[in-house]
């Protein structure tokens, strides 16, 4: 068996299913309760959501079916060139929640007021959290209305961004008490 590097104890895997669903998987070395809390509480999301060099100064969360998660990220890293100072806004609308096990929401690009940007594709996101030896396996299924919608976000660098985001979550879980 190959030893994984300690900085990334379990790399994220990705695959496309049915030409419009991106499936991401990763093992996080923490309990399902801790990993689920990281996805469901604003104080945790603020610390890790977004790619490296981005902060989340705005994060309002009403974590219940029908509730909304509105967030704003800002690039604070001058080394990111044209992205430095840029803001990116999102709006999640929760559809289903199974405490500790599953979150389903529709993710939209938005503006600072929470208005949906209809020019960019919406995503139906299903997150599952499963206990297994060594931690919690998270599976993220992101489904788009069309193959073109998935291609749009992939061309925007979404896969690199979520890889960095989940790396930040690994680091945050490692720094938090067990």
Regions found by a protein language model. Name each.
Residues 79-84, 91-110, 114:
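Contiguous, well-ordered beta-strand patches that form the walls/edges
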Residues 1-56:
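Hydrophobic ligand-binding cavity/cleft-lining segments
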Residues 26, 58-61, 90-96, 122-130:
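Hydrophobic/aromatic beta-strand elements that line small-molecule binding cavities or substrate pockets
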Residues 35, 45, 69-71, 94, ...:
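Hydrophobic pocket/interface hotspot
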Residues 23, 43-89:
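Short beta-edge strand/loop motif at the mouth of beta-sheet-based domains
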Residues 32-33, 61-66, 95-102, 128-137:
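A short, structured loop/turn motif at beta-sheet edges
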Residues 104-108, 114-160:
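Beta-strand/loop substructures that line and gate deep hydrophobic ligand-binding cavities in soluble
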Residues 1-7, 145-178:
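A conserved amphipathic terminal alpha-helix motif
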């Amino acid at each position: 068996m190959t030893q994984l590097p300690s900085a990334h104890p379990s790399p994220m895997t990705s695959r496309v299913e049915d030409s419009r669903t991106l499936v991401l998987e990763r093992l996080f070395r923490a309990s399902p309760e801790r990993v689920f809390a990281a996805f469901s509480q604003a104080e945790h999301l603020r610390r890790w959501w977004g790619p490296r060099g981005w902060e989340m100064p705005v994060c309002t969360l009403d974590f219940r079916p029908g509730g909304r998660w509105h967030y704003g990220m800002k690039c604070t890293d001058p080394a990111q060139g044209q992205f430095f100072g840029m803001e990116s806004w999102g709006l999640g609308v929760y559809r289903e929640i199974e405490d500790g096990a599953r979150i389903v929401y529709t993710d939209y690009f938005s503006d600072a007021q929470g208005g949906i940007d209809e020019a960019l594709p919406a995503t139906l996101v299903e997150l599952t959290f499963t206990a297994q030896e060594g931690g919690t396996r998270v599976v993220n299924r992101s489904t788009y209305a069309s193959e073109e919608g998935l291609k749009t976000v992939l061309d925007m660098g979404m896969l690199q961004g979520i890889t960095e985001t989940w790396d930040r979550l690994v680091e945050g879980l490692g720094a938090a008490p067990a």
